[in-house]
């Protein structure tokens, strides 16, 4: 504007012609305003309203902006300020009044709040009138809005400093200049820091404390003192009263806002930014500026943060970081049409954020080398970037023009009702309001120009990131910066299938704030930022997305620092899919890797899916893992680590279909045999160190139950009996502290049980059950071989002989093991009354049915016709001599496959074997996925898909149908072979 024009009064200038939506309504609003001016005896305003130029302009504004209409009708003296003064001088006078209000002698906090609200409203309306009239261009409008916010913030800060000094909580060096050396640093961030505030902006603040300043007082109380002052500052500015509010305040850009005080000591802040600062925080700090309080200290901390924000060398590795921020700001690929109505002018495609980000990313990459690129304002930095050759002059001009155009639209949207919204109205009247305030009487014309602007911005923005690698994110925003939920991100997450989108945002922000050991390094957070869209997409496809992602969060929480997990997942999609499968389908496996993250290491071996975990395979790896370890506790801990990892890996093979349920049972059993045997060796060596050896000692472990039949599941206990023998003349061991043989082996067994089942930092090897020993819990935990044979021949119950059919020596002296095998076979071959045997088996099955009825149709073990019936058929047939194979098989399925034809015809045998395999595959998968027995309604969706795969059936309904058919067939066979049909 010219100097002469700048000295002219408001309505003496050329004003933008605005058209009301409804001329009659506009005239009525103007009449109401004139009546209010007469009531308050504002003759100058009444005269002004009688002039056509003023009346036309103001009536249009009163109709278009309900907020300005309400403010002028409530406080018509606002117009009195521009009756005889230029708008510039009128605004300057208001700002001077605001600045002085904080130091008025005797003013109370409530009086200050009233004064600030009234003066702010006056300034707000004047700025809006100047903007709508085009007396101010958009740049001047943002500048004056920033002046207003800075004046209000400064007044409140000065008032609070003087109040705290008067109360003795701080010691100001100069009460006439309370902000000088006060140590209370108030930084303006975002648009406030860049002097680019919009009409209804929040003001983003970060508050630091310079503890070295003399005003601070007690350094141990300063955080509490200044956090209280900061809380009062927020209240003064943003609490709504009868006079409205001054500015909404957002303090969530401070370091880790979920766990830090409102005012943070400078040292703690520097430590955070240097060690845990995130990419988006680097970008945010570009715009930081001291706006109130100790401005000198504020400039000093920004200077100290300069190396963090601005990398010293032109580092193209930083481009990966920039890409990761870009993904968070916009995860869509930009396809499809842009809808004008309902479009987000700030965050939408082609919006203000894309221009700001276009500038900031170039600054982050090049600003360390070129200080002239470190400015905090968007449009001036476009010019600097063009001067340095980082962008073309065409890009500079296009983006600068559209930036101010879009900011203009943003202001009009907000002027309607003074709300911080950036979304163009979708209804006809609302859209027309914005169009008319922009100077377009035809909304269609405005729509066309607005759409063209978006396309210009989108084209430039897309060109900037043409080479950015995509991670297949879902369409929509994915923004997890700061400490506030981005509305677009909430919508995206909901559309992806997340039920509690806000909770998911909070979880992901926790990752980015580095609160877990695995996310404390900047590199880890950068990789995680890159990976987040792919993670969210993968978990969303599990059909229970929230639950799966929370399990992954628990996994992250337990990971140690330094693990390169995120790089591994990024470079290995199969590993990512596997991890997602674990979290969605197998809560038990998820719990295991959460408690023992080291088990995840085994997945890095690409051969695990092709190598079958045989006994020889496991022995070879155990030998290498134990190495030269000789210390008792170290050996046991290594066994625990090895067992946990390989139980997990066997489970993963089952989960992925590399092995079936039968093979998994054999592998779990081989692993248990190996672990129990090595544990016994370690316990024996430790016992011998103190108590020596027993003359002629022989020890063996007898596996019972599912370990004996090589049918262990992921969570099975191990059933064991420890058998021993020694020379008849051995009275005690030969060590430093001798023990009688019986006591020696009891202690050996007790220590073995402790070694296997004691909870430690590395977990538990196995839960141990020794109740199948002679006389059960009443008998000694270690059994002499002669006592064992005598008991089995003379005193054992039928059910104990049934259990003996699965007894298998797994570790010990070879000759002793051979003797045990002979004893067992002799007992099993004893002549029996088959009818009585069948009656005993039936009675026991009925007792189980009474004491442990099946939970539902998915209780594969206890359901009539289920696993117990199959096991009882096999055990009955073994004891009755109806198994034809030699040597005698241990596994239930193998026994069933070798039933004598005269006992069970081939068709029945095939049905029993098929049923057992069907149950085994299902039960192995269920035990792998869940810690406890659970009904179908508790199966995670991913687990249902797993069960369909292991069963080879299309859906759960078909599995249930097949289960019922197998139950019917097996129960009929049980009744015929063991039931009354056997009589």
UniProtKB/Swiss-Prot annotation:
One of its GO terms (molecular function) is [glutamate-ammonia-ligase] adenylyltransferase activity. CDD domains: NT_GlnE_GlnD_like. Its cofactor is Mg(2+). Residues 473-983 are annotated as: Adenylyl transferase. Its EC number is 2.7.7.89, 2.7.7.42. Involved in the regulation of glutamine synthetase GlnA, a key enzyme in the process to assimilate ammonia. When cellular nitrogen levels are high, the C-terminal adenylyl transferase (AT) inactivates GlnA by covalent transfer of an adenylyl group from ATP to specific tyrosine residue of GlnA, thus reducing its activity. Conversely, when nitrogen levels are low, the N-terminal adenylyl removase (AR) activates GlnA by removing the adenylyl group by phosphorolysis, increasing its activity. This is Bifunctional glutamine synthetase adenylyltransferase/adenylyl-removing enzyme. It comes from Brucella suis biovar 1 (strain 1330).
